[in-house]
């Protein structure tokens, strides 16, 4: 799915019939032709283009709530590229503090804040602990991976990893 909400299909079909792993070396392989299909719903507007370029950090942090994955990812890239890790951690903590507890997407927003810190390698143990205790198992699973990655920089890494290892959901 593209940033506009359309589905894109890349069709680079090759007529080579080959049962080897090196078909990409075949001299008859077509390297120059292909099609990209763009599927949209008729009479439906496309997703609005988010403001990434020229946006200040508060607007970018708010983009972490976007329903579009591409928008959330681009906002994180921009924040990490233009700010120091400790600044990114402060932004993530501020974002989390402003979240509504009864928001149905609360755990996904927590996950996005932790992902922002992870992209910047801004170790934030309080946020990590909070995501490890989230209701959504996908957020807890992500937090477990981050706890493993940051284990050498966390004071309570064994405790956090033990919490994840004893989780009730098998994907965590």
Regions found by a protein language model. Give the residues of each.
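Hydrophobic core positions within HEAT/HEAT-like alpha-solenoid repeats
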Residues: 76, 111-114, 129, 144-145, ...
């Amino acid at each position: 799915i593209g940033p506009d909400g359309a589905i894109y299909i890349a069709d680079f079909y090759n007529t080579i019939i080959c049962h080897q792993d090196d078909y990409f070396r075949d001299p008859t392989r077509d390297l120059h032709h292909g099609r990209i299909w763009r599927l949209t719903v008729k009479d439906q507007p496309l997703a609005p283009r988010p403001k990434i370029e020229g946006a200040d950090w508060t607007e970018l942090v708010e983009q972490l709530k976007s329903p579009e994955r591409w928008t959330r990812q681009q906002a994180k890239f921009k924040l990490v590229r233009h700010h120091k890790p400790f600044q990114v951690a402060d932004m993530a903590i501020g974002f989390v503090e402003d979240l509504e507890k009864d928001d149905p997407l609360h755990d996904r927003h927590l996950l996005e804040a932790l992902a922002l810190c992870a992209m910047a390698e801004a170790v934030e143990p309080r946020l990590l602990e909070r995501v490890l205790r989230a209701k959504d198992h996908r957020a807890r699973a992500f937090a477990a991976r981050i706890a493993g990655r940051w284990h050498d920089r966390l004071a309570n890494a064994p405790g956090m990893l033990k919490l994840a290892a004893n989780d009730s959901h098998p994907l965590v």
